[in-house]
Amino acid sequence: MSNNTITDFNKLNDKQKDLLTVNIIKGLVMDGVRNANSGHPGGPMSLADFTYILYSEFLTIDPKNPDWENRDRVVLSVGHTCMLIYSILYLCGYLKMDDLKNFRKLGSLTPGHPEIETPGVDANTGPLGQGVGMGIGMALAEKASSNSSLKRFTYILAGDGDLQEPIALGASTLAGHWKLSNLIMFYDKNDIQIAGNTSRVDSTDYAKLYDAMGWHVQEIDGHNHDEIRLSLKNAQSSDKPSIIIGKTIIAKGSHSLEHSPKSHGSPFSEDEIKLTKEKLEI
């Protein structure tokens, strides 16, 4: 499925278009991190499927008016995976290719962790867990102040490290208590951190924990687009805050780094990128 033109792209069926677009996003992530010689490629590749479906099919946003009051909010709590968001914001029309090429450069719109100066970014994030609290605060403010019949959602994208932080769990208890039905969190459960597998340091059953805190809980294959769609529809109709726990594979689609902590916080080698692009047919 090697397609380099819009004409070829339009000949694809919907599933092929989705797959190709996700693979292109992964290519942008790998190239951006490699060009900066710094960053985190593995996490964006595990989170790419959910985030693509979210942005392309569910978010209420307007790239021509990034600060539109009636937009949904997205908080990337797992801020070090920001090359994923920048790549998607580029495809949505918020950013330019030069912005991606300037990833992690001083003064750019694409710093190493998200900042609200970047069009389409709703929160400064970096310290793990902080974005969970920020997203819950946004959802509470929206619920308290909304004077519109349009239900606006706050989405949090979180990873293993986020939910290991007390700030995230403390805020989550409040979200359940306040029944913030306009809050949806995706937990990218790839079970890998920079030093190894999460089982080395954490055995928490987060599905049971969030259920006990009063959340609507779903567990899905985080790479299955149909499961992602259904989980988002269910979450949007819940009368509780929702957590979607997606079992994913770090560096999904890479040539040799799937499941590997080596993919977490270092650029892929040129050979790995080349072989991965061949595998993904991009």
Positions of predicted regions on the chain:
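Glycine-rich ThDP/TPP pyrophosphate-binding loop and its adjacent helix/strand module
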Residues: I61-K64, P114-I282
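Thiamine diphosphate
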Residues: S2-F153
